[in-house]
Amino acid sequence: MDFFTNPNVLFYITAYLVGGIPFGYILAKIFAGVDIKQSGSKSIGATNVLRVVKEKDPKLAKKLAIATVVFDALKGAVLVLIAKLLGFPPATWWLIGIMTVLGHCYSPFLKFEGGKGVATGMGVLLVLLPVETIIGIVTWLIVAKTTKISSLSSLSGLVALVVASFIVHPDMPYVHSHAPLLLLAFIIFYKHLPNIKRLLTGQEGKVAA
């Protein structure tokens, strides 16, 4: 079968392109008239949308940040669900999820720059590992409420999710390996390296409520 007509390959390419849709950038540009790629952390995620738009309109900032989380999560969840419904094998579900997160982190529409992959990864994992993801979300909420540091809460939630996966599913369903999850987690951690450096030096900023 020709490489570019292989259904799996076409789905991977589609996942990367859909993952690359910068909803935070689009929403902030259309509804607030700001370019989040030129302000704040320059990330396209919800935290930067909140931080940048809040300077103009605090109420609008919260709405756009929530919308960004929802749309970014849906990118991951919907594509994996479609793959499951179409009967693709489980390994393909994971690869589609990983490609979607890569698209978000390295968007082809933004010169291969993008976000941190947290919300999109959450969408993917809600479909593939719902119990572990809920544990991660609860951890994220607790740390966010306590510290008000977005990166710390996101990374804490991710660590909790990964640890929980070894307890809830010692033998990962279908694929029998934690490698796909660890790869996805690595991508998100890698995108957070600047934040981790600031956390270690006490320079990471908080997000006001």
UniProtKB/Swiss-Prot annotation:
Pfam families hit by this protein: G3P_acyltransf
E.C. numbers: 2.3.1.275
Location in or out of the cell: Cell inner membrane
InterPro entries xrefs: G3P_acylTferase_PlsY
Principal EC category: transferase
NCBIfam families (UniProt xref): glycerol-3-phosphate 1-O-acyltransferase PlsY
Subunit structure: Probably interacts with PlsX.
Molecular function GO labels: acyl-phosphate glycerol-3-phosphate acyltransferase activity
Family as reported in the entry's similarity comment: Belongs to the PlsY family.
UniProt KW Ubl conjugation keyword: no
The organism's place on the tree of life at top rank: Bacteria
UniProt-listed GO biological process terms: phospholipid biosynthetic process
Pathway the protein contributes to: Lipid metabolism; phospholipid metabolism
Topology relative to the membrane: Multi-pass membrane protein
Stated name of the protein: Glycerol-3-phosphate acyltransferase
Catalytic reaction annotation: an acyl phosphate + sn-glycerol 3-phosphate = a 1-acyl-sn-glycero-3-phosphate + phosphate
GO CC terms of this entry: plasma membrane
Entry keyword set: Cell inner membrane, Cell membrane, Lipid biosynthesis, Lipid metabolism, Membrane, Phospholipid biosynthesis, Phospholipid metabolism, Transferase, Transmembrane, Transmembrane helix
Transmembrane segments: 8-28, 78-98, 124-144, 149-169, 170-190
Function: Catalyzes the transfer of an acyl group from acyl-phosphate (acyl-PO(4)) to glycerol-3-phosphate (G3P) to form lysophosphatidic acid (LPA). This enzyme utilizes acyl-phosphate as fatty acyl donor, but not acyl-CoA or acyl-ACP.
Primary localisation category: membrane
